[in-house]
Amino acid sequence: MPILLCFAAGLASETPSLARISRFSTVVALLLLAAAYALIPYSRPVLAPVSLGEGSSWQGDVCLQSHPSTCAPAAAATLLRLSGIEAGEQELVRACLTSSYGTEPLGLYRGLALSTRGPLVPRVADSDPLAWERRGELPNIALVRFETPSREDHVLARHERRGSLRWLLGPRSEGHAIVVLGQDGDGNWQIADPAIGTTTWSRDEFLGRFTGDAIYLANTR
């Protein structure tokens, strides 16, 4: 969006049908709007911070989210631990630029990139889950959506009804981040869910909920 707005500003500056003052005002407005969009990911945690307690809650190797909006940082902590890197939910909330409205996919990628070391780097996984094992893209963090409202959805909906800045600061649709561990012999998916811990989803359940977005840690060595 910032790039498109800057492009529009360039077009406006070269539009002869606009008076000089109108061109100047239009260009300034578009550039200011572009700057605002670029700063939104960084301003969200400041304007709508997540309040967390000390430490992280773990169920085995699964980090459990301590706030309705921290599923992505908790999932990131789980994926990192499975890769031999220790990081807590609170640390990843900051790295992922998580606010009380949730985490953007780019924020999740940023958090993983800042937390990895050595040959491990975050990469976007194939949009086809059936290709993950063959391509070495497991475990990974997958973004999913549920047909029925979750507890997180209800909490975020209350924020919106109170007239908050959700339309600007929060994602337009609610989702959930999970860690996909792999498939069993029956084709069921083994899931590390930051909301409840380890669980199993059927093949159809997972494919029906998966948004097509997933991130894994690739070994570049």
Please annotate each region the language model reported:
Residues 1-29, 33-43, 150-221:
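Noncatalytic regulatory segments and standalone regulatory/sensor domains
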Residues 101-181:
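Predominantly the structural core of cysteine protease catalytic domains
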Residues 1-107:
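Active-site-adjacent structural segments surrounding the nucleophilic cysteine of cysteine proteases
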Residues 76, 80-85, 97, 101, ...:
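Sec-exported extracytoplasmic/periplasmic mature domains
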Residues 73, 137-141, 194:
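Proline-rich low-complexity regions
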